[in-house]
C-alpha cells in the first residue's frame, strides 16, 4: 500500500488494509461490532502497550459494563456519560458499553483544566463520568458544580495484566508522580464494573437515528 504523505497514519495500517472502506449506513456502531465478533472473534480488535484484546473480549466486556451502568448505576437510555481518558484499551470497551446501554457518550479532553471540564460537564448534563486517574484531581476541583452522580476511575494498567499493569500503575503514580492527589468520595473502580453477568444487560434495540456522541 502506497503511503500518502498527507496521511502518514496509513503506514501503521496492517498489511492488506485498504485506505478506504465502505460501511452500510443502515448499521449502527454496535451492529458493526457484533458482526466483527461473529466473523472474527479471536482477531485483534485493539492493541495498546503491547497488549491486545480480541473482538470477543471487547464484546463481552462492553456488555458487562453496560449491565453495570443499567443495573447498578440506574442510568437510562438518553442519559449522558462523560469519558475523560487517553487512548487506552478501556476506552473502546467503555464506548461500546455505554452505547449498548443506550447512553450518549460525551468525550472530554484528558488535558482539560478544571474550568474547561466544568463547562463541558455542565453544558452536556452528564450524570456519570469514566475518568483516567491522572485527571481525577481536575474533576475533584469542580465536581460539586456539576450534575455528576457517579464517578468511575480507570488506571493505566487496568487491561495490561496483573504484572505489567501493576508495574505501570506503580511507575506512573510513585516514580513519575503523574497522579496528583484527589478526593472523590464514592468513586468506583472501573475493573469492578465488569463483574455483572452479560445476561443482566437489557440491550434496547438501537437505531441509526439515536444520538451516540
Question: What is each of the regions a protein language model found here?
Answer:
Residues 1-26:
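Flexible, non-catalytic linker and terminal segments flanking ANL/adenylate-forming cores
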Residues 7-11, 31-54, 212:
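AMP-dependent adenylate-forming
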Residues 25, 42-76, 82-88, 92-96, ...:
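Conserved AMP-binding/adenylate-forming core of the ANL superfamily
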Residues 82, 128-130, 152:
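Structural motif
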Residues 102:
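Structured binding elements
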Residues 112-145, 160:
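Conserved ATP-dependent adenylate/AMP-binding module captured primarily in the ANL superfamily
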Residues 142-209:
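ANL superfamily adenylate-forming
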Amino acid at each position: 500500500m502506497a503511503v500518502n504523505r498527507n496521511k502518514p497514519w496509513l503506514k501503521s495500517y496492517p498489511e492488506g488494509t485498504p485506505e478506504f472502506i465502505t460501511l452500510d449506513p443502515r448499521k449502527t456502531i454496535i451492529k458493526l461490532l457484533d458482526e466483527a465478533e461473529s466473523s472474527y472473534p479471536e482477531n485483534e480488535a485493539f492493541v495498546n502497550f503491547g497488549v491486545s484484546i480480541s473482538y470477543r473480549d471487547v464484546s463481552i466486556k462492553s456488555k458487562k459494563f453496560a449491565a453495570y451502568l443499567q443495573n447498578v448505576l440506574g442510568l437510562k437510555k438518553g442519559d449522558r456519560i462523560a469519558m475523560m481518558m487517553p487512548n487506552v484499551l478501556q476506552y473502546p470497551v467503555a464506548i461500546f458499553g455505554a452505547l449498548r446501554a443506550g447512553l450518549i457518550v460525551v468525550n472530554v479532553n484528558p488535558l482539560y483544566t478544571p474550568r474547561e471540564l466544568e463547562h463541558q460537564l455542565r453544558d452536556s448534563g452528564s450524570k456519570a463520568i469514566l475518568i483516567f486517574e491522572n485527571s481525577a484531581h481536575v474533576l475533584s476541583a469542580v465536581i460539586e458544580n456539576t450534575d455528576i452522580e457517579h464517578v468511575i476511575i480507570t488506571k493505566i494498567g487496568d487491561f495490561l495484566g496483573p504484572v505489567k499493569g501493576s508495574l505501570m500503575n506503580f511507575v506512573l503514580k510513585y516514580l513519575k508522580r503523574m497522579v496528583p492527589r484527589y478526593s472523590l468520595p464514592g468513586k468506583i473502580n472501573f475493573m469492578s464494573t465488569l463483574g455483572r453477568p452479560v445476561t443482566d444487560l437489557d440491550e434496547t434495540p438501537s437505531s441509526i437515528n439515536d444520538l451516540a456522541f
